[in-house]
Amino acid sequence: MANSRTVLILCGDYMEDYEVMVPFQALQAFGITVHTVCPGKKAGDSCPTAVHDFCGHQTYFESRGHNFTLNATFDEVDLSKYDGLVIPGGRAPEYLALTASVVELVKEFSRSGKPIASICHGQLILAAADTVNGRKCTAYATVGPSLVAAGAKWVEPITPDVCVVDGSLITAATYEGHPEFIQLFVKALGGKITGANKRILFLCGDYMEDYEVKVPFQSLQALGCQVDAVCPEKKAGDRCPTAIHDFEGDQTYSEKPGHTFALTTNFDDLVSSSYDALVIPGGRAPEYLALNEHVLNIVKEFMNSEKPVASICHGQQILAAAGVLKGRKCTAYPAVKLNVVLGGGTWLEPDPIDRCFTDGNLVTGAAWPGHPEFVSQLMALLGIQVSF
């Protein structure tokens, strides 16, 4: 994309899983080049992430998230080549705020006046770099006293999706604020979003893959789309548990518990014809959703009306069960090849695993590493553009 942008994400061990991956993949989907670095690590190394979620206790709980692979080397970073900086939250900022090279990097970005977007506990690094003195900012509530001590004009996060802008500084309280957080960052980079007045429906289920619902969901929200999520036998406000599927050297993916995902609409009240596109996440949910006639009828309705349908990983099990793959070119997670072939689809090998394909109104992807292309191809079908 002509005149696009390049941004840097400052990573660390046990940064929050969503707070690194959602901006990382959303920004790439919008045509922005994104580099990720961690002090003491090189391109190809990985950082373990943390899942932070709420289950009724007085504070969040933590469990292991995905392994996040870095694509650049910290010691080789030339800050003059970057147009903006993103700082995820989680536990990583606690120790990164004590790392001199990290603090100096943030100071240099601040002096340049380039946009800095920091979320949740990431603002601890901003405080250590003396970049919040006299500036309005928010953060996860427990970070407030540190920011006040650093001279910030503290904005209380009344809701978890609060975002605050002060000049080139964008801050947010938690990953629930990602849609506005990312949209504000794109705007600060000089981006313009057009064609996003669309309504998108997500077909969800228990133990869908964590990234495969949250990344496209919040990416589309960040563009300005109205995005709804439904699940059979559940209502608005109910939650679906998710599964973290990762590649850790075994013969197949591993599974760990992920975040819980909040639904926005009652399944039984759904008027599917009011939506412009359908998204089907992968994970284990499609195995049982493919047995639900109401779900299959929704898929048939979208395909028969030639509205965009985007399905990833194991989501194509639902497409096969709905009988909509006959004569269509399609990829999926490799283990789903049998479903695709038996369903009459023409199998497209996902090599590499982040390959995505568009055949008419159908976008298919193999796994969550392909989200940037997956979301980008859906944007193309919907006529949504991000320009700089």
From Swiss-Prot:
Domain of life (superkingdom): Eukaryota
Catalytic activity: (R)-S-lactoylglutathione = methylglyoxal + glutathione
Gene Ontology, cellular component aspect: cytosol
Modified residues (Cysteine sulfinic acid (-SO2H)): C313
Effect annotated for changing E287A: Reduces catalytic activity 6-fold. Almost abolishes catalytic activity
Entry-linked InterPro entries: C56_PfpI-like, Class_I_gatase-like, DJ-1/PfpI
Keywords: Lyase, Oxidation, Repeat, Stress response
SUPFAM superfamilies: Class I glutamine amidotransferase-like
Domain PfpI endopeptidase as annotated: residue spans: 5-190, 198-383
Documented effect of changing H121A: Reduces catalytic activity 3-fold. Almost abolishes catalytic activity
Temperature dependence: Optimum temperature is 45 degrees Celsius.
Effect of C313A: Reduces catalytic activity 2-fold. Abolishes catalytic activity
Active site per the UniProt annotation: C120 (nucleophile), H121, C313 (nucleophile), H314
Post-translational modification: Cys-120 and Cys-313 are oxidized to sulfinic acid.
Cysteine sulfenic acid (-SOH) PTM positions: C120
pH-activity relationship: Optimum pH is 6.8.
NCBIfam families the record matches: PfpI
Membership in a protein family: Belongs to the peptidase C56 family.
Function: Possesses glyoxalase I activity. Catalyzes the conversion of hemimercaptal, formed from methylglyoxal and glutathione, to S-lactoylglutathione. May be involved in oxidative stress response.
Subunit structure and binding partners: Homotrimer.
The name this protein goes by in its record: Protein DJ-1 homolog D
Gene of this entry: DJ1D
